[in-house]
Amino acid sequence: MFRFEEPTVEDEWLYFFKRAERILKEAEARKGQKPFNKPSRLQYISQHNFLKGVAGEEGGSEPGKRTDRLLTNIAYNEHPPCIVPFATLEKKFLDDLRLEMAHRGSYILLRAVVDPNNYVSVTTIAEDENGEVELVEIYNQDGRRSPTSIMPEGQVFIVKEPYFKTTSHGGPGIRVDHVSDVIFLDGEDERIPEKWRPRIRLLARRSLDWKDDGNRFYKGKQYFEAAQW
């Protein structure tokens, strides 16, 4: 009888990469199609929050216990950034997106419905104006900033020429590799739909509220956040 041996960490990562490679290669056969068996809004958000609870924003697990992670970025079928003026782009919605395609000549307007998870990318669940939701992975952001300061719940943003693809885990998502392909909208930007504008909430805040928030962030050494307030 052969003695059973527990798989090593190297074995587990080899399996992960082989599985991801197979998923991404098979995804090419669905290029131009809409995703099937797409998760519901509740399923998207529940899975996102579950992963946040497992990994934690900084990758920890149990209090006082260190968890080492190997961060991976599997880039398959890379695409160039958008280089045309924004004014020439046509607005699209999530239902218009097709798998394994960078939607040239288009843009999509989204709003984050959860606080982000932090892997190699800043990962969130976002909705369009029709209430449809999708996973969004934004790469190459400033590593000195907390993910929540980049993409807090409620943040409205634009993705230019969105690249809609199958992720290495097998589900659909929008992948943003180029920092110039995402535009974060603030305050009263005219591109924000009226129903998404935080005008009433912001006007109701007193100047002391802004000051207190700024001081709190500064004391916590969250300097980017403090500067915003």
Language-model segments: residues:
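OB-fold (S1/OB) nucleic-acid-binding surfaces
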Residues: L99-G105, L109-Q141
